[in-house]
A protein has these predicted regions:
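Acidic, mature catalytic/reactive cores of soluble proteins
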Residues: 1-570
Length: 570
């Protein structure tokens, strides 16, 4: 072997490639400090590194290879057997190319949005991939992940398509309307699957299923309890409401050039109204004028949205655990300016839809969700203003959800006082656990019982900004709660972004919170500037937990850096 395996010009070539890399990221990112530019570049490069080739032909997996032993017959009895036409043969952005080397449906949507500023073409391709004919089931369901293709995941595909379009339009001067039209066609099919499959009782309650939050419930929310009771998940209905508004926003954009999309926009207004009624009123009336429910997910006593346990005899109870499951309703919000409302008549709820809605839904709350104007905008919100203030008092309370590095997934009040609920012969307990999972549910390698998760925080930040755009300075909240520091919802969103970006920034002590007590990573000159993007973060001190290379959805922090710079709030 030669003494010098590389040619003399190797260093020059390597430095040239390094310079080109820096120039490319400089062209994508706003002007940032050296510290923040490192975070941005590390997040983006990790996102690129987690793209892997993935091949899985389900029919071959079921039937086996010629001239080889047949696979276990049990495969034919699994839910995955329904997906026999799934044919994966693509480069896919993995959640973590080491620990999670496979596609995950809702993770991939966050990856797409994170890709949008640095590679719009990849962002669009990844956001559409799982909705292509090679992946979707005959009933239009989108696959979840390889071990349980049929699991329902949070339906954020419309949000991802909308944000990818908007980011490219902002950064490049024009949005890709053909992409948005193609996305809409596929999303409409998936929307039909959600509406027809999960609303089993006909009362707009979406219950059962994974829904992305793993072990967040006091019971495993995927299954009925042993006595036949079922859990009506407030976040399931809220995710569906968010999907309705995302599709409404897409339809409104497309209707500017193709007026036929106005009919779709009207449909989503109706659907959103029904979903808002489900979470917020004491009774839901279906199309046959039959009262389906005598309760709501909003608990006026506590000022929070809770899951409801519904028994076979018709009785019910709240599962009074304060988790981000009860914060998901905050994500279903949109507002439109005067010109847009004049162009798309169905957005003018007061003059067009109020008679229809008043007959089919409870008229006394319509004005709380529709038709209100402020800052020359009209608001569509699953959470009315009176509920919003009460929920945010919990969100921004440092004894509840607000941590030094973002919003926790479970209230800290359950650290010393765990929540326990007994139902028949089953007893469930939920305790605040800020780091690793305390239970084996879902394998025990993720934990939604206290840690800070970047994807939910990002969605919450965007929702606060939507509320802030509508309310302006007419709605202020204490940040933190009981601090006497009253700020607008827009400013509150930026304060959250600072806390989340702070996970990766060096503090005054020279330490990065995500590295925790690992002195090698904190201080060694060879390691201290090599950033990892963990799956989730300790709910008290911000140290990284879970998969350590999950640059996928944690890379969304680069969008936060962009916003903080754009609004001069570094």
């Amino acid at each position: 072997m030669p003494v010098a395996p590389f040619a003399a010009e190797f260093d020059q070539v390597f430095k040239a490639r390094e310079r080109e890399c820096l120039e490319y990221y400089h062209s994508c990112a706003p002007p940032l400090s050296l510290e923040d530019a490192l975070i941005y570049r590390s997040a983006a490069s990790g996102l690129l590194w987690c793209k892997k080739f993935y091949r899985w032909v389900v029919i071959r997996w079921l039937s086996g290879d010629p001239n080889h032993p047949a696979p276990p017959v049990e495969r034919l009895k699994t839910d995955n057997a329904y997906w026999r036409r799934l044919y994966a043969d693509d480069v896919i952005s993995m959640p973590d190319s080491w620990e999670y080397p496979y596609f995950c449906q809702w993770d991939l949507m966050f990856h797409s949005v994170a890709f949008a500023p640095i590679d719009p073409a990849t962002a669009k391709a990844q956001s559409m991939l799982l909705r292509s004919p090679r992946y979707t089931a005959p009933n239009a369901q989108t696959p979840a992940y390889e071990w349980a293709l049929s699991d329902p995941n949070p339906p954020i595909g419309a949000w991802a398509a909308l944000r990818v379009f908007q980011i490219e339009r902002h950064d490049r001067g024009s949005g890709d309307l053909p992409y948005l039209r193609a996305a809409m066609r596929k999303l409409i099919l998936e929307y039909g699957w959600w509406a027809n499959r999960n609303d089993r009782s006909g009362d707009n309650v979406f219950e059962g299923g994974f829904l992305g939050l793993d072990n967040i419930g006091v019971f495993d929310r995927r299954y009925p309890l042993s006595d036949g009771s079922v859990i009506e998940q407030c976040d399931g209905t809220a995710w569906m409401a968010m999907l309705s508004l995302n599709l409404l926003e897409i339809a409104v954009i497309l209707s500017a050039e193709e007026p036929e999309y106005k009919d779709l926009a009207e449909r989503f207004v109706y659907d959103f109204a029904q979903l808002a009624s489900t979470l917020n009123t004491d009774a839901v009336i279906n199309e046959t004028a039959k009262v389906m429910r005598s309760y709501r997910n909003w608990d006026e006593q506590d000022g929070f949205y809770y899951d409801v346990i519904k028994r076979q005899d018709g009785s019910w109870d709240y599962l009074r655990s304060r988790s981000i499951s009860g914060l998901i309703p905050l994500l279903a919000v949109a507002s439109f300016d005067v010109d847009t409302v004049q162009r798309v008549e169905s957005l003018d709820v007061n003059s067009i839809l109020r008679p229809y809605l008043a007959e089919r839904i409870c008229p006394n709350w319509i004005s709380q969700h529709f038709g209100r104007w402020n800052n020359d905008r009209t608001l569509f919100s699953l959470v009315p203003e009176s509920h919003l203030r009460r929920i945010l008092e919990y969100v921004f309370d440092e004894d509840e959800f607000l941590s030094p590095n973002g919003v926790r997934s479970l209230s800290k009040v359950y650290e010393e006082n765990p929540y326990t609920f007994c139902e028949g012969e089953e007893t469930g307990t939920l305790a605040y656990s800020p780091a690793d999972s305390p239970v084996a549910m879902f394998g025990g390698n993720s934990n939604w019982r206290g840690p800070v998760w970047m994807p939910f925080n990002f969605l919450l930040i965007e929702s606060l900004q939507k509320f802030g755009r509508y309310y302006g300075d007419t709605f202020k909240i204490e940040f933190p709660t009981r601090s006497g520091n009253w700020i607008s919802l827009w400013d509150a969103s930026l304060e959250l972004e600072k806390r989340l970006v702070g996970l990766f920034r060096r503090g005054e002590d020279g330490r990065r919170p995500f590295n925790g007590a690992v002195e090698l990573f904190q201080n060694d000159p060879h390691w201290k500037d090599l950033l990892l993007f963990n799956e989730y973060f300790h709910g008290d001190n911000g140290s990284g937990v879970g998969a350590s290379h999950q640059t996928g959805w944690t890379a969304i922090v680069l969008k936060m850096l962009t916003q903080l710079q754009r609004y001069n709030s570094m």
